[in-house]
C-alpha cells in the first residue's frame, strides 16, 4: 500500500480489507488468497520432503527433531480419536494442521509489509498504487476456509458410504433418530441439517477467528499513531500466537472426529 495515497483511517482500513481480485461478483477470484494458500502448501511439502529425505538414524538435527515431535503429536491425537483403520487419516491430519497453521501465521507479519511491496511492484508496472490491493492471510478469506471444509465434507460422505454402504448411509439419514417409516421426512431434515452444519461451522469458525485477528491488527495500524502502535501490537501478537495454533488444532481435531463418526457403524 502506498501510504501517500491513503488519507483517512477509513480508507486505510477499507484498503486493507480489499482482496486482489480477478472478475466481479459471485465469479470473482481472490488471487491473493489463492496465491498464498498454494505457496504455503508448497512450502510445507518442500520442508517435510527435505526432512524425510535427510532423516538419519543417528542424532537428528533441530528441524528433524521438531518434525518428528510434531508427527508424533499428531499421530497420538489421531489414535485417540479415530477408532477405525485407515492409513490416510494421520497424514491428512498432519497436512491440515501444518497448512492451516502456516496460513494463520501470515497474520503475524507487519500489516503493511506485503501490501507496500506489492504497491511498489504495481507502481513499476505503470498502475495506480492506490488500487494495489493485497491480503496476506488466506484463512481470513471465507472462500478458503469453506473450501477446505467442503473437502472435509466430501471425505465424510466418502467414508460414510465406504463403511456403511450406500444403503446403510441412506438408512442412517432416513431412520434416525426416529426408527419408523412415518418419520422419514423429519429424520431426513434433522440428519441433513446435522450433516451440513458440520462443514459450515468448521469453515466459519476458522474464518471468524482469523478475520477478527486480522481486523484488530488493521485497526491498531489505522487508528493509532505509528509510535504508539507497538503498545497494543506486541501483546496482541503474543496472544494471537495462541489463537493461531489453537485454531489449526481445532480444525484438525474436528476433521478427525467427523471422519471417525462417519466410519462408525450404527
Curated annotation (Swiss-Prot):
Single GO MF descriptor: proton-transporting ATP synthase activity, rotational mechanism
Keyword tags: ATP synthesis, Cell inner membrane, Cell membrane, CF(0), Hydrogen ion transport, Ion transport, Membrane, Transmembrane, Transmembrane helix, Transport
GO biological process, one term: proton motive force-driven plasma membrane ATP synthesis
PROSITE patterns xrefs: ATPASE_A
CDD domains registered for this protein in UniProt: ATP-synt_Fo_a_6 (cd00310)
InterPro entries: ATP_syn_F0_a_bact/chloroplast, ATP_synth_F0_asu, ATP_synth_F0_asu_AS, F0_ATP_A_sf
Function: Key component of the proton channel; it plays a direct role in the translocation of protons across the membrane.
Family, as annotated: Belongs to the ATPase A chain family.
Subunit description: F-type ATPases have 2 components, CF(1) - the catalytic core - and CF(0) - the membrane proton channel. CF(1) has five subunits: alpha(3), beta(3), gamma(1), delta(1), epsilon(1). CF(0) has three main subunits: a(1), b(2) and c(9-12). The alpha and beta chains form an alternating ring which encloses part of the gamma chain. CF(1) is attached to CF(0) by a central stalk formed by the gamma and epsilon chains, while a peripheral stalk is formed by the delta and b chains.
Protein name (Swiss-Prot/TrEMBL): ATP synthase subunit a
Gene name of this polypeptide: atpB
Amino acid at each position: 500500500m502506498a501510504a501517500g495515497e491513503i488519507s483517512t483511517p477509513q480508507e486505510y482500513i477499507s484498503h486493507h480489507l480489499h482482496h486482489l481480485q480477478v472478475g466481479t461478483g459471485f465469479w470473482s477470484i481472490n488471487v491473493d488468497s489463492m496465491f498464498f494458500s498454494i505457496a504455503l502448501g508448497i512450502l510445507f511439502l518442500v520442508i517435510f520432503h527435505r526432512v524425510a529425505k535427510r532423516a538419519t538414524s543417528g542424532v537428528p538435527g533441530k528441524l528433524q527433531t521438531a518434525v518428528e515431535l510434531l508427527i508424533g503429536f499428531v499421530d497420538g491425537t489421531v489414535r485417540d480419536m479415530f477408532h477405525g483403520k485407515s492409513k490416510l487419516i494421520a497424514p491428512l491430519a498432519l497436512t491440515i494442521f501444518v497448512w492451516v497453521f502456516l496460513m494463520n501465521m501470515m497474520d503475524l507479519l507487519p500489516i503493511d509489509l506485503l501490501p507496500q511491496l506489492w504497491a511498489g511492484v504495481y507502481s513499476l508496472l505503470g498502475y495506480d498504487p492506490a488500487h494495489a490491493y493485497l491480503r496476506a492471510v488466506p484463512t481470513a478469506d471465507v472462500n478458503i476456509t469453506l473450501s477446505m471444509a467442503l473437502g472435509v465434507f466430501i471425505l465424510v460422505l466418502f467414508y460414510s458410504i465406504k463403511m456403511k454402504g450406500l444403503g446403510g448411509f441412506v438408512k442412517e439419514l432416513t431412520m434416525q433418530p426416529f426408527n419408523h417409516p412415518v418419520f422419514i421426512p423429519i429424520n431426513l431434515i434433522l440428519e441433513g441439517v446435522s450433516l451440513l452444519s458440520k462443514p459450515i461451522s468448521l469453515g466459519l469458525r476458522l474464518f471468524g477467528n482469523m478475520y477478527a485477528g486480522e481486523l484488530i491488527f488493521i485497526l491498531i495500524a489505522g487508528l493509532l499513531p505509528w509510535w504508539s502502535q507497538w503498545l497494543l501490537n506486541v501483546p496482541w501478537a503474543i496472544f494471537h500466537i495462541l489463537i493461531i495454533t489453537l485454531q489449526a488444532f481445532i480444525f484438525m481435531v474436528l476433521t478427525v472426529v467427523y471422519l471417525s463418526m462417519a466410519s462408525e457403524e450404527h
